Amino acid sequence: MAAARPTVSIYSKDGSVSSETIALPFVFKAPIRPDLVRSVHTAVAKNKRQPYAVSEKAGHQTSAESWGTGRALARIPRVGGGGTHRSGQAAFGNMCRSGRMFAPTKTWRKWHVKVNQNEKRYAISSAVAASGVPSLLLARGHRIEEIPEVPLVVDDAVQSFQKTKEAVALLKEIKAYRDVVKVANSRKLRAGKGKLRNRRHVQRRGPLVVFNEDAGIVKAFRNIPGVEIVNVRRLNLLQLAPGGHLGRFVIWTKSAFGLLDSVFGSTTEAAQLKKNYFLPENIISNADVTRLINSDEIQSIVKAAGPSRVKRAHVQKKNPLKNKAVLARLNPYAKAYKANVKLNTGKTPKAAGEKFLTVLHEN
């Protein structure tokens, strides 16, 4: 796995590897949590929505009155007049043709969703760590088979690019242009009403270029299909994990890659650009729980599996206060306790009276 390498090579703008290397930032060793990334992405993506609602007049722009009872018809308001199909038809109700909807939507709906700050930072850390795992990038559909290594770091001279042809030449030299071709070929007409709302086409996502300082790099890369550009101080989960799926192909500039330790810190040192923030760490070092359970160290102290027990389908409930056998099974001392209570009451047995003895010995 590429994220386990202690250092990362730096590639020049002509695609050749330079002699200098850079240490792998601590954020690439953060726990990868797909569940957390998915939930945070779902919440954060809702904050870009534009409020919408139906017209307050919709379904009520007609004159209609109820005909009352006695006509063997529903009491719903009906359009008056005659000489047209519309006269006599029901109006206003949500069950009526041309009526309003039930509970018309309002613009003051609660559109935004609050997310815990530490939760968002955890999700972004996981997304950055996942961008250094080649198998996750391939599973997401990125064409990185010919990429020299992941994470991919290029020289800071790229930040000074002014022309798109320079950016395209760089992508071709580092074998990343296949991902751009994939995006260009994926452009399709959107299904549904979105075609009418200025989002006529859909296409896949390509590489994400992360820079430290903009000396022209934004203008150079912004017109390439599928390529997105972001400052390392403004890393966004919507770009690092589009659709809530981990494994975005990221191209880092050298200075941006070196700044990651200042942005995210480590598990022991706080981040410089995030107040009192420490990187999360795994509770267990090996996430393969099945392998741990089946290891010799744990199996040597675990009791052997006993015979299988079949639970009785139905057990009749018996009252131990009335059933002596059940009481004895629940509390074996109950019988001795009851006998002891009788002995310790201190009462002497009452002698039989003369009248009883006379009747007893009667011939």
UniProtKB/Swiss-Prot annotation:
Localization per Swiss-Prot or TrEMBL: Cytoplasm; Nucleus
Domain of life: Eukaryota
Keywords from the UniProt entry: Cytoplasm, Nucleus, Phosphoprotein, Ribonucleoprotein, Ribosomal protein
UniProt region (C-terminal-extended nuclear localization signal), positions on chain: 280-363
Domain comment (free text): The eukaryote-specific C-terminal extension harbors a nuclear import signal and delivers the ACL4-uL4/RPL4 complex to the pre-ribosome, triggering uL4 release from ACL4 and incorporation into the 60S ribosomal subunit.
Subunit field text: Component of the large ribosomal subunit (LSU). Mature yeast ribosomes consist of a small (40S) and a large (60S) subunit. The 40S small subunit contains 1 molecule of ribosomal RNA (18S rRNA) and at least 33 different proteins. The large 60S subunit contains 3 rRNA molecules (25S, 5.8S and 5S rRNA) and at least 46 different proteins. uL4 is associated with the polypeptide exit tunnel. uL4 interacts with its chaperone ACL4 and the nuclear import receptor KAP104.
Record's protein name: Large ribosomal subunit protein uL4A
Organism: Schizosaccharomyces pombe (strain 972 / ATCC 24843) (Fission yeast)
Taxonomy of the source species: Eukaryota, Fungi, Dikarya, Ascomycota, Taphrinomycotina
Gene name in the database record: rpl402
